[in-house]
Swiss-Prot record:
Superkingdom field: Eukaryota
Enzyme nomenclature, EC number: 4.1.1.32
Binding site for GTP: 313-318, 431, 462, 554-557
Keywords for the protein's UniProt record, in alphabetical order: Decarboxylase, Gluconeogenesis, GTP-binding, Lyase, Manganese, Metal-binding, Nucleotide-binding
InterPro entries, per the entry: PEP_carboxykin_GTP_CS, PEP_carboxykinase_C, PEP_carboxykinase_GTP, PEP_carboxykinase_GTP_C, PEP_carboxykinase_GTP_N, PEP_carboxykinase_N
Originating organism: Drosophila melanogaster
Name the record gives this protein: Phosphoenolpyruvate carboxykinase [GTP]
Binding site for Mn(2+): 270, 290, 337
SUPFAM superfamilies, sorted: PEP carboxykinase N-terminal domain, PEP carboxykinase-like
GO biological process annotation, one example: triglyceride biosynthetic process
Active site: 314
Amino acid sequence: MPELIEQSKIISGNVCGLPQLHKLRQDNCGLYSHIRGIPISYGNVDLLTTGVRAFVEEGIALCQPDQVHICDGSEQENKVLIKSLLEAGTIVPLPKYDNCWLARTNPADVARVESRTFICTERREETIPTPVEGVKGTLGNWISPSDMDAAVQQRFPGCMKGRTMYVVPFSMGPVGSPLSKIGIELTDSAYVVASMRIMTRMGAAVLRQLAKKEEFVRALHSVGAPANGQVEQPSWPCDPERTIILHKPAENLIVSYGSGYGGNSLLGKKCFALRIGSTIAKQEGWLAEHMLILGITDPKGEKKYITAAFPSACGKTNLAMLNPSLANYKVECVGDDIAWMKFDSQGVLRAINPENGFFGVAPGTSMETNPIAMNTVFKNTIFTNVASTSDGGVFWEGMESSLAPNVQITDWLGKPWTKDSGKPAAHPNSRFCTPAAQCPIIDEAWEDPAGVPISAMLFGGRRPAGVPLIYEARDWTHGVFIGAAMRSEATAAAEHKGKVIMHDPFAMRPFFGYNFGDYVAHWLSMEKRGQVPKIFHVNWFRKSAEGKFMWPGYGENSRVLEWILRRVNGESCYVDSAIGHIPAEGALNLDGMKDKVDVKEIFSLPKEFWSQEVKDIRTYFESQVGADLPASIYQQLDELSSRVDNL
């Protein structure tokens, strides 16, 4: 990163690529309450390991905070944070619930910013495939080391003047688990600290773990301030014009500026758990994936664990918290968003949820769609950009049936709202940040340091036409091809364009930490490392010619999981098809279903549709990935093409 003062130079052993400035380096003179001459407002500097302390000192030199707060994760500390957030007007209390708070952000800071999210490597091709000339690449953004340095130099010097720098030690995964990794985030946002306390294992226990083995990901975050010095909303400072999120995998470094929104500021989540996580996983021979993890127990008491990768708005959280309609089946939740998976010494693929909470999209969550989530979120939760009610509660689209009469609603912008307002009360990307341990169906092994054994992996998306309810990959390579070819319906940014089918390989398109072609090769290599699970593709969203969903979804999805369990147990309850194994006639248990399902139609494979699908996948692979895609994936596409020709 940039040199900030004349003749400063980066010395060997620099822990994070931030400048180590010889002129400014000084001993702390044994003072407990200062670090580099900056007062410690909370916490004990003696708990910092050598590497953490060096990182903090570099952050102080760069950002120039007024004081430093070393987080311990305690209840007492949380009260201090909540008090400061209340005083700043960042949050308001929700007296209807137990220890719940509502934050309203600057309206310009409401979501992840893909166009400003970069991976920094020496060579561009390490980060992204080279698309065909004239085609815009969609598999990540690369930035050179010199441009990253310049971006930091333009934004960070002095950005924490007048503010507190919080030192946030956090563990992704149970503290001490062989599958876990540690991070240190430096931030000037108390909202981030309070949220990280929910989303990660945060505090003194992490520093004690680092004292045993000092390996950690460095994460630097500032909400920033506009270059003109005018803060629009003092309760939510940010700098939307200059927001940037940078990752440097070679140095396990994340740098984020200008946004307080969760995906850009809670750096343990997508930045660490997926982007940096996937690069570490490649080096160490494991997988860091955008997947839920659930446990399902059949009527005989036999339990299996399944992971599933779906793009956003395709029901990951709903499946992770499934309430099965099939009698005597039980689903339990290990995680709803991210899975880290590694083979154990016996070659069994084991997964942990590296997170400690749920950062879920609120709108659409209701007692009808996800009663388990609704029974999770109304205590110890930070809500962001949902609407509030006059009786001290919250509201979002989907909660209409639970509204008491005569309750007034204030929308996410702080304005009065009625159902005739013509716009949503809650922002479409509004969130709840809630502890996972509160989930009524949290799995008993959700914090098992060894992880849970994975028997099946699901890929899926929102496909209104052509794609059957469920099919199984023929083998591992075919399964990897299915993941690479994933597509899902998304609403185009411009409404008049209507719905478009977007490519979202492995549901990871915004989160790859390195070249997608190398990522696919890494997935293919897993077969040589241990016992790989079976792979399936599901589609809950196929529609009839009349535009009605052909499958009722929600609890009825347990019927699909039952068939998956039968296949995992080796039952030959399938027939082969052009695209993979589908349930044999009568093999999908439909007993007792209220809705009549046209089984023939929901498993039909229209030749015209699949011929076009093959063409679209080929165009995507050739234009976006080209020679970087392993030859065996092109071979899978050729084989699919010839099978479709014979439909």
